[in-house]
Amino acid sequence: MKQTLLRRAGLALDMWHLFRRQSQLCRWLQLTVSDAGAAAPANKVEARWLGKIRIGTCAHHALLVPFGSQAAYRFVAPPRSRLVAWCALAGGGSQHGNVEFVATVRNRQQGQERAARLRLSPSQEGADRRWHKLVLELENGEEQQIELTLATRTEMEDRVATPSALWGEPLLEWPRPIGELRGALRVAGPLARRGSFVAAARTLRGHLSEGSYHSLYQIWLREHALSPAKLADMRRRSTSFPYRPLVSVVTPVYNTDPRWLRACIESMKSQAYPNWQLCLADDGSTRAETRALLREYESDPRIKIKMRGTNGGIAAASNEALTLADGEFVAFLDHDDELTPDALFEAVALLNEQRDADVIYSDEDKLDLDGTRTEAYFKPDWSPEHFLTNMYTCHLMVVRRALVERVGGFRDGYDGAQDYDLVLRLLDQTSRIHHVAKVLYQWRRIPGSAAAHEGAKPRAHDAGARALEDYVRRNKLDAEILPGALTYVYRIRYRIKGEPLISIVLPAVPDVGHRDRRNACERMLNMLVEGTTYRRFEVLLPVDRGRAADLTVNIPQNLAVREIPMDAAAMRGRVRQQKRAAADATGDHLLFLDWGLQATDREWLTALLEFSQQAAIGAVGAKLHYPDGSLKHIGIVLGVNGVAAPAFHLHPRSSLGYWGTAVAVRNYSAVSGDCLMTRREIYSEVGGFDDEMGGLADVDYCLRLTRAGYRVVFTPYASFVQDRSWHSIGETDGREGNSLQTRWRDRLARDPYYNSNLSRDTPDYEPALTTSSSVE
């Protein structure tokens, strides 16, 4: 009984911490390194992530910051944040003197600094080596632009013999919005009601912790495991495919650990689809074991090997391997990664359905050194605007060989981003790009590799930016390339063509008897005067014909507002009001806004217009969040609970979303009508909003746009705060949901921008499980 009570008390303490705080890991942010002012040793190495390291009884992802250097991160810190990090010494422990860990936080807006220090002695630590916790509270109760600097210093003269000073998993913590607990409570609630306190607490803890996604993915893997019977069936079906092209798999090799190179080659030999060829080009390896292992496989007629005399880089080696290829299609496999046994089978199965496909890509995951599969990336179908911000297609990629040869293969000077550069050039030749929604490729997480940490190869990020600049020049786009919020994420900022007129369409002024609501309305009108750098717009405001002179808010004198008188019947509902007002608009673009919005910067109107002006784009939406810092909208996911819901609703504003969905331009099936820009000619072409759809009219409108061949885009560069008291997306009555289901049943069943392996129970990008399992 006593042990049970203690266990429950421990779980309760854990849950209390998780309820109070959430966190963001610094290792997912872009890392910059500079000298810290101290003399650096001649053999200094760069700061880098080393993977998970166990010291004592605890293990943390370790960041090595050499003496004389400092590592820095920049991010937005929510109100009441704190920095938490762990420090440890690894290596020899006989020296005397101290090693000092210094964490400094600087408010980039106000210039204020705070620092926390921890001193460890190698001689004392030698007997009781462990991770030490360091906490730095951020005093300001408001959101801050923060720069975090991590540095290590030592008094010892012999730095070579000094133990390594490691930072363990620096993270930012802040109070958790109560709304984020909704999904977790929905998962754990049934267990609690059945009296299983421990199971409910563990499930809730797993759902709220960083490890929850990993745990869910392990369950997903068990449910989708390839049994011997399934593989045998694939081998049988492969022989009956009407179309059985030879697929040449291209792999450049350089000083690869023989363990991983053997695993890579054996993954090819395990393919269920038999008509393949492996083309290996060794790029002048100096490691004898690597070359010896390649020679072991020379006798296999399916494997062609070329030994280069000199090292020319990954592009040169890949091109050498391409010269060995005989297949109609080529696939790309890195020398330390693996294909799943069904990889080529699934690619050829798609080719039998889509004979004109030129490019095929699949989902992927990561493979830890101990063989654990983790970090699944369930990708959307082909998303052009998404791809121009990030090489999301990545692995596995299968391409028609003639097309690769037509664009000249891989180019020198883009190592690390050579595949991104290749696909950007392929886009000049084809749009026949298809997605296999299955995990067919496994990146091995080797310390120092891009798979282990995306900041491991900063030159690759720069090469990707150059490839994107080349794409912009080739296609004569009037745009510039800017850095994105994450490594390997970019922003193409398009310049505005001419000076088109924007018609800003508002709903009627609501009942603003409450002073706070009236002030919110007036602040929004003032934002239109002072809060934008783009000035050519008109404002349309529906008014009750019988009460046109009775507006309850003050309109700024220098804001030209055109009132649209309506009969009382036409005033019923926001959609009906804006639809009637849009009919009187004269602008080239329509911008539908709800009340209560406040832009976070002055470029918001230009950020929307740069996409709305593009011929292929039908609608563009903005990033919306609540005053408490929780997200309201970054795009809408179809099929959630049978209808639709905003992605990552009520997650913290600083959330990156799923693989950066919240901080970069993305394609979605729909965006919120609370802030939606569309060209007036397109609006007329598809029939505008359907007022019978009520609160789901925005989703219905976007689906009619995509049916007409237009794309819908979300941009985080137009960002607003909106009070909770205004129209809330996702909150509709059952009649509207039934109407949407009747009209769009097939589309709601499959959202091309939300992978079929993701759950429709929530819009949070969690793996879809077919069995009910608690998360340990």
Cite the ranges covered by each PLM segment.
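Conserved donor NDP-sugar-binding/catalytic core segment of glycosyltransferases
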Residues: 342-374, 597-643
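Nucleotide-sugar donor-binding/catalytic module of glycosyltransferases
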Residues: 201-456, 470
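Glycine-rich, basic loop-to-helix element that forms the pyrophosphate-binding segment
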Residues: 308-325, 567-585
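Short, acidic, metal-binding catalytic loop of nucleotide-sugar glycosyltransferases
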Residues: 266-275, 521-536
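C-terminal, non-catalytic tails of nucleotide-sugar-dependent glycosyltransferases
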Residues: 4-9, 18, 25, 182, ...
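A recurrent flexible, glycine/aromatic-enriched loop bordering the glycosyltransferase active site
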Residues: 315, 323, 373-402, 583, ...
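A short, conserved alpha-helix in the catalytic core of glycosyltransferases
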Residues: 403, 413-439, 468, 604-608, ...
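Gly-Asp-aromatic-enriched flexible segments
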Residues: 5-187
